[in-house]
Amino acid sequence: MFNYGYFSFDSKQSLMEKAAEYWNPGKVNFWTDAGTPMVVDRREGYFLYDMSGKRLIDLHLNGGTYNFGHRHPELVEVLKSGLDYFDMGNHWFPSVARAAFAEQLVKTAPHTKYAIFGAGGAEAVEIALKTARYATKRKKIVSIIKGYHGHSGLSVATGDERFSKIFLADNPDEFIQVPF
């Protein structure tokens, strides 16, 4: 039994079955067929641990979002202390944290007037594409064949056809792909 407080699983196999049923059967099958039916249990620093406790060096780091390693103690502490005062906020109203952070960002980037916040990489790509279209008054976007830029709106349209086609990317003629 693997008990995580809010949820539990009888076995690794039962978790794999639930992941295939409710999350992403394609990824579960891909890794199982590749001989790597690993289930990540937790992450610390530059290591991952599978459900059996086996420690592995994380060479993937999922797009470079963990430059300090997973769950870096200083960052965990800052986040915890921040939660004593701040919450997720409301993007419609000014906030203390958002204004202070925006000011710091703008002051570090020459010729920047505003900071725009996004929830993740796909949203950052969306913002960049919309900004480029607005600034140039042009619609066409050039991206790299088989590239991955996210799974939302414009970002999915710039990526691999296997994703853009199934999500019915609008106006495919506006997206040109070139070799890397």
Regions from the language model: what does each represent?
Residues M1-E44:
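Active-site-adjacent loop/helix segments that line or gate small-molecule/cofactor pockets in enzymes
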Residues F2-K18, L83-F117:
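Cysteine/selenocysteine-centered motifs that mediate thiol-based redox chemistry or coordinate metal-sulfur cofactors
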Residues V39-F47, G64-K80, H91-Q104:
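A structural motif shared across PLP-dependent enzymes of the aminotransferase-like
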Residues D50:
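Acidic surface patches and DE-rich sequence motifs
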Residues L56-I57:
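Generic structural signal for well-ordered beta-strand positions
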Residues H60-L61:
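Short clusters of small/polar residues that mark proteolytic maturation junctions
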Residues E103-F180:
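PLP-dependent aspartate aminotransferase-fold enzymes
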